[in-house]
Swiss-Prot record:
It comes from Acanthamoeba polyphaga mimivirus (APMV). PANTHER family: STRUCTURE-SPECIFIC ENDONUCLEASE SUBUNIT SLX1. Signal peptide: none annotated. It holds the Pfam family GIY-YIG. This is Uncharacterized protein L300. Residues 2-82 form the GIY-YIG domain. SUPFAM superfamilies: GIY-YIG endonuclease. Residues 23-43 are annotated as: Disordered. Gene3D superfamilies: GIY-YIG endonuclease.
Amino acid sequence: MDNWVCYLIMSLDSKETYIGSTNNRQRRLNDHNNLNPSRKGAKRTRGRTWIPILYISGFENKNACLSFESGWKRLSKKRNIQRLLLINEISNIKLNYNNDPKWNRIMDLLYFVHNITFIGTKFKLNSDVKHPVILPENLFIEIMNEDWITELSWPYFINTYMISFD
């Protein structure tokens, strides 16, 4: 069994994205793609072909992974350019949201990891610094054929690396 990971997948049919978590990557991807007749995957992903964009690992346990997933997903509800201003200033580049669902999910992730604190087994958004700043030891982002993601301004506790399917 794999350790718990949070993942981003994208539909080849519609370019929609989906964030989830699992402790068995291949089984879960097969579920999303309906390759396992006894399992159907998440209702929202049925009937499409999905490919992995990235996996995030390094969580202490299942609860930590699930809280990370929840925090990352929640950011898509109220996107605004203001949240990327500090990251733009730090990295000296201009990041913005656009009409690409994959790009927007990556921007949400970038914002989330720059503004989290880790309390107990939960990741909390801490952009207004209401909580003590406690960062995780190390999180790893395994990126599938999207090398531009490694070039973004990730915090020091994030390690990115590419996995190529060539």
